[in-house]
Amino acid sequence: GYVSEHSGYHHGEASLNAAIVGMAQNFVGSNNINLFEPNGQFGTRLKGGEDSASERYIFTQLSRLTRLIFRQEDDAVLSYINDDGQLVEPMYYAPAIPMILVNGSKGIGTGFSTDVIPHNPLQIIAYIRAMLMETSVGDRPTIEPYFKGFKGTIRNIAAASATSGASAKYLIKGTYEIVADRKVRITELPVGTWTDDYKEFLEKLMEVPAASEKDKDKGKGKGGD
């Protein structure tokens, strides 16, 4: 209610609530930098955030880092939307670092789709500083895909080429350890593979398939010979 009132948002609060919850999530695979503090159940890796509590039971506020990224000094120079004579939110924000690279973005639009993988904020900052110092491109630090708290591996299996325009592809692997001949302990899942979904997948593998009618008939034939 407060946010929609002061931002001139007229499209219903359901999508607004979902956006706020998503910006506060901090489990592995959500945000590298969550701009809001999650006070309550904002979702976990069990269901990829779908297990967040109802909006009326959770609370949030700006995180400590948010105002360091979206500088207060910029407020006076931003262009603001005029909503029926009331100045509301800015037409766009100007963060100190590109947040689309920090937290990534995935979705569809009219005639296009996007899938930007998250990257390491510290490497992004180092790269920006190198650009400001006019360091040659070859001497600038690399920016690698990064998911805060992820213990698995991320490997580039199709390096991007500036000349051919090929897209980079990354293979994300979890980790496991063999503890016995018939026992494996999974210690990390690939990002985007949520715990409950993977548990359901494993349980299906453990199910003994029911014998088909054809197999039953074959068994009867062998027994009668």
Model-predicted segments: where are they?
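Catalytic phosphate-handling regions of large nucleic-acid enzymes and associated NTPases
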Residues: 1-167, 216-218
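Charged, surface-exposed alpha-helical interface/stalk elements
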Residues: 136-225
